[in-house]
Amino acid sequence: GYGSTTVTRAMGDDEVEQWYAHWELAADEPNRIHWVLDLEGEAVGAAFLHAINAEDRRARYAIGLYDPSFFGRGLGQQATRLVLQHAFETLMLHRVDLRVLDFNHRAIATYRACGFVEEGRERETCFLDGRWYDDVVMAVLEHEFAVARGGRRET
């Protein structure tokens, strides 16, 4: 998860409910779209476009999976590509960016596979487990996403 350097256990039911409650409140905010990631009828995570700015045609992306047992299955990459497809083809955005803590190598690799490129770092933005971590700033532009997916339409 975002708030720990290692993910060693699944979120408990109470934690998942709190996480959903936080994002349900946020879902009422304008300029935000969220999706529940469903695997065979089970909610396994969520993805968000927020800070959507129609004038500048940009938004910020976030995604989370609740349980490490879902890691490594390609769910994050599939969800990210579908959200980006919606962002660029339906919302007609030009740019989608995100921030990810520098120790989250799996997420960074997923974002790169979806066309995101590193634009910079915000140094020592998060203090966890007695140590400072950087936020890596990444973004993908509409033409970069088209190249990254090889002209294939995600289904």
Segments predicted by a language model, with ranges:
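Conserved catalytic-core motifs of GNAT/GCN5-like acyltransferases
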Residues: 97-100, 117-133, 137
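A structural signal for the main folded, soluble domain(s) of proteins
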Residues: 89, 118, 142-145
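Glycine-rich acetyl-CoA-binding "A-motif" of GNAT/NAT acetyltransferases
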Residues: 42-45, 106, 132
